[in-house]
Amino acid sequence: MTPDHVRQIFKSLETGDSAAFFAHVADDVDWTVMGTHPLAGHYRSKAAYAGTFTKLGKVLPQGAQLHVEHLLVKDDEAAVELRSLATAINGLRFDNPCCTVLAFDGETIVRGRSYLDSALVARLFEENPIA
C-alpha cells in the first residue's frame, strides 16, 4: 500500500461520492466508529458501515465532504487524518476533524477504526433530526 493509493481511495469522499470509496471496502469489513454519538458503533459488514454514510446523507445534503489532511502508511496499514467540510440542512458548518486507522488486504480495506468529534456529531443530529 502506498500513500498515493490511499489518497486516491479517499478522493471521492471529497465530493460526497461514497460509492467509489466503498468499492475498496471488503464486504465483511470490521469497522468501529469510536465515541458516544449517533454514528458510533461496531460494524461487521460493508453494508452496515455504509449505513453511517446514508445517515449522514440525510442531514448533510452534499455528503460528509471528507478531505485527507495527513496520512501515514506502513506495509498494509494506514492512519488517515481527515476533515469534513460539509454544511448541514440547517446551515450548521460541519467542520469535523477525524482520524481513521485502516488495515488492508491487498488494495481492500478489511478493518477500520474511526475517531470523530462526538460532541459535534451529536449536535449535528440534534439540530437536524431524522424523521
Task: Locate each region found by the language model.
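Hydrophobic pocket/interface hotspot
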Residues: 6-9, 20-21, 25, 29, ...
